[in-house]
Design a protein with these regions (language model features):
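Glycine-rich Rossmann NAD(P)(H)-binding loop
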Residues: 9, 178, 207-213, 241-248, ...
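Conserved Rossmann-fold NAD(P)-dependent oxidoreductase catalytic core, especially the SDR/UDP-sugar
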Residues: 73-74, 84-149
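Conserved beta-loop-beta element that borders a ligand/cofactor-binding pocket
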Residues: 121, 156-185
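NAD(P)H-binding glycine-rich loop region in Rossmannoid oxidoreductase-like domains
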Residues: 38-42, 46-98
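Glycine/proline-rich active-site loop of Rossmann-fold NAD(P)-dependent oxidoreductases
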Residues: 164, 176-193, 229-241, 265
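Substrate-positioning beta->alpha
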Residues: 152, 186-190, 208-231, 238-239
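N-terminal Rossmann NAD(P)H-binding glycine-rich loop of SDR-like oxidoreductase domains
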Residues: 4-26
């Protein structure tokens, strides 16, 4: 078999970082496209291409690096500060399409051996952020009639796909958890930083949210394994797949396991905003980072926009009597296609928190 070269766009993000690690471990040549280098283990071989995808001239100039690319994982994402409001704003949608065009147009022209492209959507494809959705949401449902950059990107890729030999796989993951820091939507470092501050203050790990309903999660490493599978699987050609860990959870029921992974006592009280809490305790964080010899990462740099995402997931700003159907998806299609990997969600949280501690991002438990 000829050399397999994967270009991973958004390589420093929660999905991209796991993909870099997994593809490299499987023997692929990896080109990591991101402004920041992915924070992976030191022995992971990859070529970092520090591109700003909003710089079309720079993307065109990099075309010489794209010739040998056989696979693309497009996991790049633009989010506005504060996160949620931007999901409804046309300029944010247009920016995400522009980023994809700037990279993919010169890449498709240069990569004559391109075989497969994976791209990410999510449960917002079903309208989960604007209305109740069917339980479970299935890939065969009609396109939900709301404005979304997912549709702009999908239509762009399908139009290019119609004139080419490569195939396309669209992924709709549930809430993704992984090891990336400073990103828009990964609350693992948010929980880790909050827990470290609470321990520093001699307090238990108080659950900050409302009781909430049944939810699903997906491990970034599991997604990376699915990307590896899809890159070679005939059953993944030109298909759309939901993907989850395989179980369900509630935040309140999972909180004791999260506390245990951090060697802390769980506690429950009234909901409060982690955005506000973390802003108020930046000085405590700075002090414990210095004293415990952690990476010198200011709290805003560690969190990105993910503390806003945490408030959303924990239902902090939801009305106390809010009653909505759970956002659950079917993964039958993916399993029937041949990918059946799963992980216990409580074990997933423990794994990622421990890894952050190993990297000295948060204190050891």
């Amino acid at each position: 078999m000829s050399e397999r070269t994967v270009l991973i766009a958004g390589a420093s993000g929660v999905i991209g970082q796991s993909a870099v690690q997994r593809f490299a471990a499987a023997g692929w040549r990896v080109i990591a496209v991101s402004r920041r280098a992915p924070d992976v283990s030191a022995d992971t071989p990859f070529q970092h291409l520090p591109l700003d995808l909003l710089d079309s001239a720079r993307c065109r100039a990099a075309a010489g690096e794209f010739g040998g690319v056989t696979h693309v994982v497009y996991a790049a994402l633009y989010e506005k500060p504060g996160l949620y409001a931007g999901w409804f704003e046309q300029d944010q949608m247009d920016t995400n399409l522009t980023m994809m065009r700037n990279l993919m147009e010169p890449l498709i022209a240069a990569a004559t051996g391109l075989r497969h492209v994976s791209v990410f959507q999510g449960t917002k494809a079903y309208g989960a952020h604007v209305h109740q959705i069917a339980v479970p949401a299935r890939e065969r449902s009609a396109r939900d009639p709301h404005a979304n950059f997912y549709w702009l990107q999908e239509d762009f890729l399908r139009e290019r796909r119609a004139r080419a030999d490569w195939s396309l796989t669209i992924w709709r993951p549930q809430v993704v958890f992984g090891g990336a820091t400073g990103v828009a939507m990964n609350i693992v470092p948010v929980i880790g930083a909050y827990a470290a501050i609470q321990r520093e203050l001699g307090q238990p790990l108080i659950y900050p949210g409302r009781p909430g309903g049944v939810a699903e999660a997906v491990d970034a490493d599991l997604i990376a394994d699915a990307l590896l599978w899809a890159g070679e699987a005939e059953a993944a050609r030109d298909e759309t797949f939901n993907i989850t860990n395989g179980d369900v959870f509630t935040w309140a029921d999972t909180w004791p396991a999260i506390a245990s992974a951090l060697n802390m006592e769980p506690a429950f009280g009234e909901p409060f905003s982690l955005v506000d809490y973390l802003r108020q305790h930046e000085g405590v964080w700075d002090d414990l980072v210095r004293r415990q010899g952690l990476r010198a990462t200011p709290l805003p740099e560690l969190l990105g926009e993910s503390h806003h995402y945490a408030d959303l997931l924990f239902g902090v700003n939801a009305p106390a009597d809010a009653a909505r159907a759970p956002v659950l998806v079917s993964t039958i299609k993916l399993r029937q296609a041949g990918f059946g990997e799963c992980i216990d969600t409580e074990e997933m949280f423990a794994k990622w928190l421990w890894r952050l501690a190993e990297r000295k991002v948060i204190p050891a438990a």
